[in-house]
Amino acid sequence: KPKHMASPKDIILEAPIGSATYNNEFGRPSIFGYFRTLEYKDYGFHKPIMLAGGIGSIKESLIKKSNPKPGDLVIVLGGPSMLIGLGGGTASSIKGQSNSDLDFSSVQRSNPEMQRSAQQVLDKFNSRNTKTPISFIHDVGAGGICNAIPELAKDCNLGVKISLANIDCHDATMSPMEMWCNESQERYVFTISKKKLP
């Protein structure tokens, strides 16, 4: 077993604790979960899968996304860009190869406190009696904002003008590529009319 890989025993004992810790800090505890493993003969390093989940609800008026209009603002909500998570989307898709340097540089770091703060902003928008001012929202996952913002633009059939100088960064020495492509956690991108921005 490669040294950087957790053993099945470690995953079984520690993974539920990690899930519960994050969700409890966020304020949405994990209320169910289970393990799954292959029951037929296989070859390689055996690694069980842990699944966890919770239950949520959504207002009927928020089920469908609206269509942003030309001139609407694109907002990046959540934590700053940090020099972490570069190559995570690639690392998670590689077959038959393992590069510990890539693995560790691509590991994302969770920040439940920031996630909770971002969620409270969205909750405030969505708790209004009138319709939410957010017209379109997209999570920031693999690829960071260099993936999320173009996907948002494609889904809206619009172009986007980006100013990297306006991207909040944790490290002032980050290159444009690092600012654009890092996969820092706890971020969303959404569109909103200039008139509706609080």
Description of each model-found segment:
Residues 1-198:
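Glycine/proline-enriched, intrinsically flexible loops and inter-domain linkers
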